[in-house]
Amino acid sequence: MKKSFLAAAFTLGVTLQPAQGQDFTAAEAHARLGIEAAEGQYLGYASLCDLEARIRNVNLPKQRKPANAKQGERRPTNGYRPKPTHIPATQVFDNLWFLGTASTTTWLYGTEEGYVLIDGLTTDSQAQKYVIEGMEAAGLSPSAITAILVTHGHGDHYGGADYLAERLGVEILMSQKDWDLVATLGVHPRFGAPPRTGGIVEDGDVLRSGSSEMTIHLTPGHTPGTVSPIFKVHDGDNQHVAMLWGGTGFNFGPDVEIFQTYADSVQKMRGIAKASGVDVFLSGHPRRDGSVKLLAQLSSRTDDAAHPFVRGAGGYALFDVLEHCALAQAERFLTQSDKR
């Protein structure tokens, strides 16, 4: 392993080159391509190619209830965790709002005729602060939310969903496989209990709210039933097409088959995105896709300036990063398995 080259790539954004007389392994070759694709727009994803990273599995069934917690009681965020960086509710497009923190966001899609909330943030208190109070401060009506789409069954995306669903009287939507996943999870000390009931979305479903609609695409890998929606956004007279990659991290254990499934999902969505004319690429984690920086650029945008969130053809480098990093990790663990 040329560890010094990998370290340089992650800390400095340097393109990897093999030392004279040395060749990259298959894993290192994919990692190099993934890191190169991340340079510029997608540095937040480059760590996925770290071949020294510990790959944990957060999808395993487990009871994580604190010893002093009552059955079913939702627990507050751990005190030792730093407070998330606050970002005010921000209108990114005419029909798309950013609600959340620099760590985790929920995207509010639609108009006052009807909104779909994409993900539910991490806790009840975050949902209250960033969704309910954030919308009200921006002059929006939380009561116009008609559904909560949870992209995948991890607590940082469903943590506040139950609270919002109960308060607003709306349904939580997930894929069947991720409903099955959350049914195996216990009460998390930070995120609380996972949602237990709601609606099911399937591959190709069209979710409508008011005059807005989005198409749901099943992209397994991050979890068995991760979904990635595609929807139209408007910037004045200009229309664009956005895709939100529903699940990013490799926190499903050193499973070669799942890494390959992840890569297959990336290939699938690359084709769908091109056919749909996608030119806006979003994430539920702003530090991944650079949304924090883009929001700052948006705040100072002049009338004749390009929209910072519209990446155009260059945005498709995201798929190269995700695919090569997934294949790099697959090769890494396949090689380790062969050596046993």
What are these regions (language model features)?
Residues 82-138, 229-250:
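Conserved beta-strand hairpin/beta-sheet module of binuclear metal-dependent hydrolase folds
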Residues 75-76, 85-86, 91-93, 129, ...:
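Metallo-beta-lactamase
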Residues 21-79, 236-238, 247-340:
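Accessory terminal helices/loops
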Residues 7-15:
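Bacterial N-terminal signal peptides
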Residues 125, 153-159, 179-182, 224-227, ...:
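Active-site environment of divalent metal-dependent phosphoester hydrolases
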